[in-house]
Amino acid sequence: MTHVFLHAFPFDERMWGRRYGTAPSLYRLGPSIDVWAQRIATEVDGPIVAVGASMGGYCAQRLLAHGDVRAFVLVGSRADADTPERRQAREETIRLIQTEGVEALWEKQRPALFPEDADEDVVARARAIALEQDPEELATGVAAMRDRLDSTALVRETEAPVLVARGEHDPFLSAEEAQALAAAARNGRTHTFAGCGHLPSLERPDEFDRVLEEFLDGV
């Protein structure tokens, strides 16, 4: 099985650091998350284990419709489509990127990505990756998230085991929402990373690797 690691916004595949497997740069795969999933499914030979953080989790879920997914991990990621309010927020984010640039985007998003007491080196590394992104590609990513399809039915119908993980202080996915998503799946479970924000794979890489290994050992 090929392990496919799908990155969060506004980063790229480097956020996964030393992890093994395939880690594509999503923005360059096309204009929509479904196109991303189709491209990945076409390029990966054989069964897939998909590990997606935030935006990458949206892609992991769409892979259920296009590829042979044997297990998947969603980190800080939800299954429903954007509400009108979230779509409006995406539009504002696109305008921010286009008018003020990537650094302004980072300054706006940083408080939601990491808790105040997050390790400064971790935050600095994340910032460095974010600031190297192409503004047009980031805008494409935001539009893809805005227009993504609801994946609830895919999660509910698949036989593939799913781990729904989140940081304790993640503002984008509550504990109740994570539990509900895992409960909707036929074989779902949850894990909460204590003290973390939206990106536990960056804040707690050793714990993340251990949790991932334990989950996959049980698949």
Predicted stretch roles:
Residues C196-D209:
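Catalytic histidine-centered segment of alpha/beta-hydrolase-like enzymes
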Residues P171-E177:
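Conserved alpha/beta-hydrolase "acid-adjacent" motif
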Residues Q61, A65-E107:
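Flexible "cap/lid" loop of the alpha/beta hydrolase fold
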Residues D82-E85, E100-E157:
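Conserved alpha/beta-hydrolase catalytic His-Asp/Glu region
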Residues T158, V164-R166, D170:
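Short beta-strand/loop motif that positions the catalytic acidic residue
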Residues A183-H198:
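Catalytic histidine neighborhood in serine/cysteine hydrolases
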Residues M1-D34, Q38-R39:
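Conserved HGGG/HGGXW glycine-rich cap/lid loop of the alpha/beta-hydrolase fold
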Residues G52, G56, A60:
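Gly/Ala-rich beta-loop-alpha elbow adjacent to hydrolase catalytic centers
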